């Protein structure tokens, strides 16, 4: 028999009204993403030392991906399968495209606009989807937004797989520049570094995380110095800042020039991380770190590489490392490798957070979530996700062999996510901010024109490796959408077959049911109904405990719920109590700790005291069959059943003590 999620899981965020009414997939969510909760108190923007500390911290988490792009970006523009010959005019044109891509996409689009669309301070594709989903009233509209958000999230997983592989590989390739005879050790060394990186994940990053920011600070300082050194040799490269060189590049190279955008886009990979990590550092530190250090350092380095190419077109084989003086080559390789590891860690941690959000929002099966820090709630470790990412990264390195080949696979995932973000952001402008069409549409069209240009330039790389992120995204999208549909169908079936709580309580008051000592806790996703496991228990055992607690864990489309609004409790009579706990999509519930905290909370309802050794938790353990009346295609039913069978058990997910859990089985035809 398989452990399925619906009877004991929190329902998908927004699917359950907070009033305590019967809930299910068809329940209409409140029109506000706050789900009836008060907004958090305004936090003053950090200044002085606090701002500087947060900005340095942001360097280690937010800018790892985009910060390591100089390792391979220009090499791809001039030496990739669609690269152009590094003539003076082409070098100036490509560098002009690099500057304006960074300025428009990162500074203008993300810094100035997208980062304003936060979900209670949190960013990212799923947080944005949850934010705009509340304003959509039509079923078709919500479905379209859901599909967009899930596909964007699926593309981010592809990005999370490629980034560690290409960053570490690009850094280690410097060894071949310093000693060409050592080229054969590049791939094995990269694999060893990645294996150790993923093995280390279970230890957490609480201790080493403090040095991530300083490492990236040294990295940005290093690439800035290297860039200045190159510019001083040929200051004429500064002409590339004029947009006329970008325009003349397209006019001169035509379609071939357009395809070079597939390499130029590599300089803005990681732009989505600015938005996704907004909740960790805040908008101001991220902006200060970008405008004050990251962007100037990156721009100086790209211009320095360009100056080198003006002087020596043959340096296109690896302009980053050839920019360094011979005596500094090995130290640069060491710093680059450290920066690549930091960039990889940021993407791995991002995949953990994305999965946690997907679980709480109802788009992913439960997996093991371990908190690796007692002080930082966001520091988590997901073993299943870690090993899947690690295996995929190593396979990519072994399959593609070079960062140049991997670059062909990189752009599609990044640009696809950018398009999804733009489409969802348009809904924020129209529905959340109330912008008129004449104001919102020109900005959306401008963003989409740039995003689509980068995307189309990368689509032609499909056979060269672009198939990988598309295949990975399609797989993740299929899994997430199947889980969502299966959960909704199952929740609806259980709701229709259930018994309203008020009718059950009236029946209990009339009947004389034998009571036994102790406390029984029944988990239910429907606060207005009776959990099926309670009905089965009463039918077969014909007894009830002296005290029965019905616990509902409700997930909401906000990142965090204030502790003052965490729990509602009330006495139902006849020894029954109801506890409804609210969690955001960035939180993980712990039911025993929750129940233990009830006496300390100032609740309008009763003050419940739980004695752990006198408490029994009852859960349903259902066997799913694919021959039921649901309209879901049979292949999706079977896939959902497999996913449910391999999901983490409800008892483990909610932190229930194994020796105090009783499971009762039943068959359900889906």
From Swiss-Prot:
Gene Ontology MF, one: symporter activity
Compartments, record wording: Cell inner membrane
Signal peptide coordinates: none
Stretches with biased composition (Low complexity): 15-35
Record keyword Cell membrane present: yes
Region Disordered, annotated ranges: 1-42
Paired cysteines (S-S): none
Chief location: membrane
Family annotation (Pfam families): K_trans, K_trans_C
Bilayer topology term: Multi-pass membrane protein
Transmembrane segments: 51-71, 91-111, 144-164, 180-200, 208-228, 254-274, 290-310, 322-342, 380-400, 406-426, 440-460, 464-484
Catalytic activity: K(+)(in) + H(+)(in) = K(+)(out) + H(+)(out)
Any one Gene Ontology cellular component term annotated for this protein: plasma membrane
Keyword vocabulary terms for this entry: Cell inner membrane, Cell membrane, Ion transport, Membrane, Potassium, Potassium transport, Symport, Transmembrane, Transmembrane helix, Transport
HAMAP family, per the entry: Kup
Function: Transport of potassium into the cell. Likely operates as a K(+):H(+) symporter.
Similarity section: Belongs to the HAK/KUP transporter (TC 2.A.72) family.
Protein name: Probable potassium transport system protein Kup
Organism of provenance: Anaeromyxobacter dehalogenans (strain 2CP-C)
């Amino acid at each position: 028999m398989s452990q399925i999620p619906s009877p004991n899981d929190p329902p998908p965020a927004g699917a359950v009204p907070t009033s305590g009414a019967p809930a299910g997939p068809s329940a209409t969510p409140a029109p506000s993403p706050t789900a009836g909760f008060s907004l958090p108190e305004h936090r003053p923007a950090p200044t002085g030392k606090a701002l500087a500390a947060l900005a340095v911290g942001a360097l280690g988490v937010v800018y790892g991906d985009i910060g390591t792009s100089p390792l391979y970006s220009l090499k791809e523009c001039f030496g990739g399968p669609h690269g152009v010959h590094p003539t003076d005019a082409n070098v100036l044109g490509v560098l002009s495209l690099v500057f304006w891509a960074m300025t428009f996409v990162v500074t203008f689009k993300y810094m100035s606009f997208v980062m304003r669309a936060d979900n209670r301070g949190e960013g990212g594709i799923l947080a944005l989807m949850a934010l705009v989903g509340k304003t959509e009233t039509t079923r078709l509209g919500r479905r379209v937004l859901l599909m967009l958000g899930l596909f964007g999230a699926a593309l981010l997983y592809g990005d999370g797989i490629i980034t560690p592989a290409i960053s570490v590989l690009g850094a280690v390739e410097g060894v071949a520049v310093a000693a060409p005879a050592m080229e054969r050790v590049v791939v094995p060394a990269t694999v060893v570094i990645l294996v150790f990186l993923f093995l280390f994940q279970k230890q957490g990053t609480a201790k080493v995380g403090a040095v991530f920011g300083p490492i990236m600070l040294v990295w940005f300082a290093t690439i800035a110095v290297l860039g200045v050194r190159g510019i001083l040799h040929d200051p004429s490269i500064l002409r590339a800042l004029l947009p006329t060189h970008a325009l003349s590049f397209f006019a001169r190279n035509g379609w071939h020039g357009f395809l070079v955008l597939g390499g130029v886009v590599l300089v803005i990979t990681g732009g989505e991380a600015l938005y996704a990590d907004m909740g960790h550092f805040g908008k101001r530190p991220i902006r200060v770190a970008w405008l004050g250090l990251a962007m100037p350092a990156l721009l100086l380095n790209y211009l320095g590489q360009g100056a080198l190419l003006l002087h020596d077109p043959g340096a296109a084989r690896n302009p980053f490392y050839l920019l360094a003086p011979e005596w500094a080559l090995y130290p640069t390789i060491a710093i680059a490798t450290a920066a690549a590891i930091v960039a990889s860690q940021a993407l791995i941690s991002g995949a953990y957070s994305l999965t946690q959000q997907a679980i709480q929002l109802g788009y992913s099966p439960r997996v093991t979530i371990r908190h690796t820090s007692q002080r930082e709630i966001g520091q988590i470790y997901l073993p299943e996700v870690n090993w899947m990412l690690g295996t995929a990264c190593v396979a990519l390195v072994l399959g593609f062999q070079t960062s140049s080949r991997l670059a062909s696979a990189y752009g599609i995932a990044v640009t696809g996510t950018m398009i999804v973000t733009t489409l969802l952001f348009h809904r924020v402008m129209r529905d959340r901010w109330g912008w008129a069409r004449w104001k919102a549409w020109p900005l959306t069209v401008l963003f989409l024109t740039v995003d689509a240009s980068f995307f189309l330039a990368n689509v032609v790389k499909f056979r060269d490796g672009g198939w990988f992120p598309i295949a990975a995204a399609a797989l993740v999208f299929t899994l997430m959408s199947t889980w969502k549909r299966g959960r909704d169908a199952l929740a609806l079936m259980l709701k229709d077959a259930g018994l309203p709580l008020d009718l059950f309580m009236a029946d209990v008051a009339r009947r004389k049911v034998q009571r036994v000592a102790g406390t029984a806790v029944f988990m239910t996703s429907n606060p207005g109904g009776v959990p099926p496991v309670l009905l089965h228990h009463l039918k077969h055992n014909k007894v009830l405990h002296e005290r029965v607690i019905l616990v509902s864990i409700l997930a909401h489309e906000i990142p965090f719920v204030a502790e003052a609004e965490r729990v509602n409790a009330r006495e139902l009579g006849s020894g029954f109590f109801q506890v409804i706990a609210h969690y955001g999509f960035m939180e993980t519930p712990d039911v025993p700790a929750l129940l233990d905290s009830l006496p300390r909370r100032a609740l309008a309802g009763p003050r419940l005291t739980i004695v752990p050794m006198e408490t029994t938790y009852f859960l349903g353990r259902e066997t799913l069959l694919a021959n039921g009346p649901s309209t879901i295609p049979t292949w999706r039913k079977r896939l959902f059943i497999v996913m449910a069978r391999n999901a983490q058990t409800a008892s483990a997910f909610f932190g229930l003590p194994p020796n105090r859990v009783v499971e009762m089985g039943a068959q359900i035809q889906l």
